[in-house]
Amino acid sequence: MLHCTQVCLSALTKRTHRVKVQVLKDFPRFQLYKGQVANVKPSLMRNYLHNFNGAKYILSEEHDINTELLKQYQTLEAKLEEDHQQLSKRHETEVQKNMELRKESVFGHKKEEKPKEEKKGLLDSGITIEEVKIPGLDI
């Protein structure tokens, strides 16, 4: 008799369906690295990862996972996490220093306060009419 060769799936099941794979090569474009066990879309596996032995399908967790590669990936991931934490701490201290410098540049250092000299205008000065001499004017 005839057997069904295709399964009719809805758009939701196609969109959410993932397959479990172990990556055998680095794929930084997809943020997948050697030894990593990941759930990816079947199309990604078919079109990119499976080519040239870049990844393998995992059908049973006990037998198909290469534990040596997985341990290498876990040590690499731990090292990268430590480096990332150190980098973030350095970045945070640099940001704090920059903020302090900006505050100092905006608000300025505490300047030595000089006594302000009052501007003496013409009306404020003690000049009287007797002191002013205008040629040709006799008072």
From Swiss-Prot:
Coiled coil: none annotated. InterPro entries: Ribosomal_bL9_N_sf. Residues 83-121 are annotated as: Disordered. Signal peptide: none annotated. One of its GO terms (biological process) is mitochondrial translation. Disulfide bonds: none annotated. One of its GO terms (molecular function) is structural constituent of ribosome. Component of the mitochondrial large ribosomal subunit (mt-LSU). Mature yeast 74S mitochondrial ribosomes consist of a small (37S) and a large (54S) subunit. The 37S small subunit contains a 15S ribosomal RNA (15S mt-rRNA) and 34 different proteins. The 54S large subunit contains a 21S rRNA (21S mt-rRNA) and 46 different proteins. Component of the mitochondrial ribosome (mitoribosome), a dedicated translation machinery responsible for the synthesis of mitochondrial genome-encoded proteins, including at least some of the essential transmembrane subunits of the mitochondrial respiratory chain. The mitoribosomes are attached to the mitochondrial inner membrane and translation products are cotranslationally integrated into the membrane. Belongs to the bacterial ribosomal protein bL9 family. This is Large ribosomal subunit protein bL9m. It comes from Saccharomyces cerevisiae (strain ATCC 204508 / S288c). The gene is MRPL50.
